[in-house]
Amino acid sequence: MYLNEINQSLKENAYKNPTSIQEKVIPLVLDKKDAMVKAQTGSGKTASFVLPILQLWAEQNYEGKAKIRVLVLTPTRELALQVSQSFIMFSQNFTKKPKLVSIIGGQSIGEQLLDIQKGCDIVVATTGRLIDILDKK
């Protein structure tokens, strides 16, 4: 399910072959195993976890109000935005898209809390802002 849509997004965004990091990490994530990866910029780290997470999410065929199924923590606002954009880009051809909320500084914490309460499948957050939100609860 959704493999054709993911493959179409890969083609539309000029992805041809997986990088070595993606070849190692994607199977681990699909097996629901943790992976800690350190590699240089541009090595494909983000796609190595975003793609299998989207595949696993799509296979579950969740119904009803969205609930947080995925939490991605990033050290910086810029990286959180990059990861969020990757989720959007790779799910662009899905008929049912995952609901994504970015929890980052520089935006209204009240609106972010409201977005979470409305329901979301994926949260991408900076650690600092997530701690701020948890302190408010």
Residue ranges of model-derived segments:
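Walker A/P-loop NTP-binding motif
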Residues: 23-35, 46-64, 86-91, 131
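Conserved pre-motif I regulatory segment
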Residues: 1-38
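Proline-centered helix-kink/hinge sites
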Residues: 18-20, 27, 52, 75-77, ...
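The conserved Walker
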Residues: 39-43
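Conserved nucleic-acid-binding Ia/Ib motif block in the N-terminal RecA-like helicase ATPase lobe
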Residues: 5-8, 63-135
